[in-house]
Swiss-Prot record:
GO terms for cellular component: plasma membrane. It is a multi-pass membrane protein. Its main location: membrane. Pfam families: DUF2614. Belongs to the UPF0295 family. The chain crosses the membrane at residues 12-32, 43-63. This is UPF0295 protein Bcer98_0460. NCBIfam families: PRK02935.1 (NF002796). It is found in: Cell membrane. The keyword Membrane applies. The lineage of its organism: Bacteria, Bacillati, Bacillota, Bacilli, Bacillales. It comes from Bacillus cytotoxicus (strain DSM 22905 / CIP 110041 / 391-98 / NVH 391-98). The keyword Transmembrane applies. Keywords: Cell membrane, Membrane, Transmembrane, Transmembrane helix.
């Protein structure tokens, strides 16, 4: 079985959600240090900053999501948003591309990196 790919927008949203829970956990750890006000306040502030960072990530991905290309997946016929040259469907994980040079090739997220040099086989 190959690597399980996920939609880029969903990956970023999952990261933001994990920041919320990590921030709450860090802030909750501060409760165990009630005797030392400095340590308790430090944990509470770090937790608050993690939750605040998740807010910024959610805002950023929301703004980015409005600028993405919206296409209809050929497999499930549901609308999905696509970031980059290659992505997968949000609903059925079907590999998608808008680049005609990549059609028929094996799906690889490395195609989205700018450092990849593509060789021209028609020379």
């Amino acid at each position: 079985m190959g690597i399980k790919y996920s939609n880029k927008i969903n990956k970023i949203r999952t990261f933001a959600l994990s920041l919320v829970f990590i921030g709450l956990l860090i802030a909750y750890l501060g409760v165990f240090f009630r005797e030392n006000i400095i340590i308790m306040t430090t944990f509470m502030m770090l937790g608050f900053l993690a939750v605040l960072a998740s807010t910024f990530v959610y805002f950023w991905i929301g703004m980015l999501s409005t600028k993405t290309v919206q296409i209809v997946c050929p497999s499930c016929n549901k609308p999905t948003k696509m970031l980059g040259r290659v992505d997968v469907c949000m609903h059925c994980n079907q590999p998608l591309t808008l680049d005609s040079n990549l059609e028929g090739k094996e799906f690889d997220e490395k195609y989205n990196k700018k450092t990849i040099k593509h060789t021209n086989i028609y020379k």
